[in-house]
Amino acid sequence: MHDANIRVAIAGAGGRMGRQLIQAALALEGVQLGAALEREGSSLLGSDAGELAGAGKTGVTVQSSLDAVKDDFDVFIDFTRPEGTLNHLAFCRQHGKGMVIGTTGFDEAGKQAIRDAAADIAIVFAANFSVGVNVMLKLLEKAAKVMGDYTDIEIIEAHHRHKVDAPSGTALAMGEAIAHALDKDLKDCAVYSREGHTGERVPGTIGFATVRAGDIVGEHTAMFADIGERLEITHKASSRMTFANGAVRSALWLSGKESGLFDMRDVLDLNNL
C-alpha cells in the first residue's frame, strides 16, 4: 500500500451508507477518495461522488466497473449485500487490494471465503464499526464472566424497516462475545424465536429479540437478569455517520498491512484492555 494518503473506493456509493462513507473519506486526514462504485444500469453512473454525497465536487465519478478503477484505490470499503461483497472480495484478492467489510448476513461459506482471502490481503471485517458498540462488546465479555453463569441473558435489537437480515450482525456479535466469555459456542445456546407454548426458559441459553420499525438507525441491549435485579448494557446510534467514520478509520489503519483478518477491536486496540 502507498505510504502517502490511503486511497479508498466506496461500494454502493448512491445508498444511504455509501453517501456517508464518501463524506467520511473526504473528511479524514490521510485518506483520499479514489473511486466510487454503483451497480450497472444505475442512473447515478457518471455523477460526481462528492456532489452525490452533498460534499461538493471531487472529480471522482461514479463507475460500475472495478476493472476501470483498479489503479485508483488501495482499500475497498463495502457495506452492500453478501453476494456483491463476495464478488468484490475475489477481485480485491486477485489485485492485492485491502478491504473493509461492513456487510452483514453472510452464511458460513461466505465467512470462510473472507477468512481464506485474508491469507493474501488485509481485511477488517466487523459487524459494527461504531466505537461505542465495540467498547460495549468488551464490556459484555467482562459482565458475562461475572454474571453469565447465574443470570438469564437476552439480546434485544431494533433497526429501520428496510434492514433485510435478522438478528443484526451486531446482535450476533454480542451473543458471540458473551458465549466466548462463558466458554460456549453460540450455535449451541442461542434461542432466536419464541412462539406458542414454549415452556420455561432453558437455563444457560442466550435469547434474541428483533424489532424492525420506522427509521431506527440501530439500538442494541444486552440484559443479564436475575431475581431482584438486572443489568442492561445498551448502545443507541442516532446517525450512520458513526459507522462510516469507523470504517474509514479502519481503512487508514490497514496502511502497511499486507494480509490478515482483523476487526474493530484490533483497530481500537481493545484486545489489550
Curated annotation (Swiss-Prot):
Pfam name, any one: DapB_N
Effect of residue 163 to A/C/Q: 625 to 830-fold reduction in catalytic activity
Residues involved in (S)-2,3,4,5-tetrahydrodipicolinate binding: 160, 169-170
GO biological process, one term: lysine biosynthetic process via diaminopimelate
Pathway: Amino-acid biosynthesis; L-lysine biosynthesis via DAP pathway; (S)-tetrahydrodipicolinate from L-aspartate: step 4/4
Keyword Hydrolase carried by entry: no
MF terms in GO: 4-hydroxy-tetrahydrodipicolinate reductase; identical protein binding; NAD binding; NADP binding; oxidoreductase activity, acting on CH or CH2 groups, NAD or NADP as acceptor
This protein's UniProt keywords: Amino-acid biosynthesis, Cytoplasm, Diaminopimelate biosynthesis, Lysine biosynthesis, NAD, NADP, Oxidoreductase
Stated regulation of activity: Is inhibited by 2,6-pyridine dicarboxylate (2,6-PDC or picolinate).
Cellular compartment(s): Cytoplasm
Record's note on what induces expression: Expression of dapB is up-regulated by ArgP and is repressed by lysine that prevents the binding of the ArgP activator. Thus, ArgP contributes to enhanced transcription of dapB when lysine becomes limiting.
Effect of residue 159 to A/Q: 135 to 200-fold reduction in catalytic activity
Binding site for NAD(+): 15-17, 38, 80-81, 102-104, 126-129, 163, 243
Enzyme Commission identifier(s): 1.17.1.8
Active site annotation, chain numbering: 159 (proton donor/acceptor), 163 (proton donor)
PANTHER family: 4-HYDROXY-TETRAHYDRODIPICOLINATE REDUCTASE 1, CHLOROPLASTIC-RELATED (PTHR20836:SF0), DIHYDRODIPICOLINATE REDUCTASE (PTHR20836)
Role, per record: Catalyzes the conversion of 4-hydroxy-tetrahydrodipicolinate (HTPA) to tetrahydrodipicolinate. Can use both NADH and NADPH as a reductant, with NADH being twice as effective as NADPH.
Similarity comment text for this entry: Belongs to the DapB family.
Name used for this protein in its record: 4-hydroxy-tetrahydrodipicolinate reductase
